[in-house]
Swiss-Prot record:
Region (Disordered): 12-49
Main localization category: secreted
Subcellular location as annotated: Secreted
Protein name: Promotilin
GO CC terms, sorted: extracellular region
Alphabetically ordered keywords of this record: Cleavage on pair of basic residues, Hormone, Secreted
Superkingdom of source: Eukaryota
Known role: Plays an important role in the regulation of interdigestive gastrointestinal motility and indirectly causes rhythmic contraction of duodenal and colonic smooth muscle.
Length: 92
């Protein structure tokens, strides 16, 4: 399954990710203000414990007409098989 997104859908997804990032940074800022009364060494240790988790894999979509699809079919099949192989190897 290869998802195909329009440009406006990609923009919407990017905007959602930016909003999530802004909310997270605001939460971190509020926490750091609350923790501000701690010893500076404790604050540094607290910063070192932060873990960043990715919420979703990156997806790229494109549109092709039938002529373009015929022209690039072999290359697309090769890319797809590489991705599927690497996914299967990572799952093992």
């Amino acid at each position: 399954f290869v998802p195909i997104f329009t440009y406006s859908e990609l923009q919407r997804m990017q905007e959602k990710e930016r909003n999530r990032g802004q909310k997270k940074s605001l939460g971190l800022q509020q926490r750091s203000e609350e923790v501000g009364s701690l010893d500076p060494t404790e604050a540094a240790e607290e910063e070192g414990k932060e873990v960043i988790k990715l919420t979703a894999p990156v997806e790229i979509g494109m549109r092709m007409n039938s002529r373009q699809l015929e022209k690039y079919r072999a290359a697309l099949e090769g890319l797809l098989s590489e991705v599927l192989l690497s996914t299967q190897n990572a799952a093992k």
